[in-house]
């Protein structure tokens, strides 16, 4: 099976996972280390910690998919090191109606108008939600505070974001730090291996 077919099959399986689990990813984050990070296990560990940070802050099991990519441009200082992409679900409407204590403290300090709107039963703007998610990501020590270290975008094309995350192939997905059904991925890996051996 050639790389393009394998990648397309992998994306198809991930899309099925999205449909079956009802995930609606809202945010696409690109996180670049301050330095050339060459330890894959450290990057995976950082993904696990960042996922815990998000869930702890919102006090909700927000689903995250993590991808690890290599810097491929030999003219750049991070060449051969890794950076991360994350697809992140938005906090639920219930959570926005009844924010966690950490959310309330953060909003009181950084966005009191939004906290007032919540307490008055009003709507929270997408911009306010985005601002809070960016601050939450920056709470994690592995995420640089500067604009070059973290790029957070709202997702308007989930399929396009998924395709972008898989552009370096199936090895970029970090399943141990992603909310996904391992059975489907394992079955796919087994079937792919069998096709390669017997075709």
Roles of regions detected by a PLM:
Residues 1-82, 90-199:
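Right-hand nucleic-acid polymerase module
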